[in-house]
């Protein structure tokens, strides 16, 4: 089960059909990573800087907004609740401009990034970052989205 909650109405303007798009990307991740068979629960909250600032402060002790926060709940098993993914509308919009990528592409990237975090992937250590980025880039490529870690040629 995938549940998407819209905390901030601006998401509709930013990405069109945010619930449909988010569910599609999460389903895609579950399928590509061969996790669909477990029928896990994943919750996505499309929020804003204010909520992510509050959560980041409360749970990580970092007093600034961030693009995505993930909270992992249970290990992968049949019917498990994998966790929650929170995205900030303002961060996604601003970062897509800074990186010169389509908002929708960056939105998809951050959903994939959050999904990998709730599956236990991390990027704190160089080896972990290489593994996680390779998965992200591979999944994004299958969605027709270029590698976000390689600067765009001008």
UniProtKB/Swiss-Prot annotation:
The keyword Nuclease applies. Its cofactor is Zn(2+). Its EC number is 3.1.-.-. This is Endoribonuclease YbeY. It is found in: Cytoplasm. PANTHER family: ENDORIBONUCLEASE YBEY, CHLOROPLASTIC. Zn(2+) binds at residues 113, 117, 123. The gene is ybeY. GO terms for biological process: rRNA processing. HAMAP family: Endoribonucl_YbeY. GO terms for cellular component: cytoplasm. Belongs to the endoribonuclease YbeY family. One of its GO terms (molecular function) is zinc ion binding. InterPro entries: MetalPrtase_cat_dom_sf_prd (IPR023091), YbeY (IPR002036), YbeY_CS (IPR020549). Single strand-specific metallo-endoribonuclease involved in late-stage 70S ribosome quality control and in maturation of the 3' terminus of the 16S rRNA. The keyword Ribosomal protein does not apply. Keywords: Cytoplasm, Endonuclease, Hydrolase, Metal-binding, Nuclease, Ribosome biogenesis, rRNA processing, Zinc. Binds 1 zinc ion. SUPFAM superfamilies: Metalloproteases ('zincins'), catalytic domain. It is an enzyme of class 3 (hydrolase).
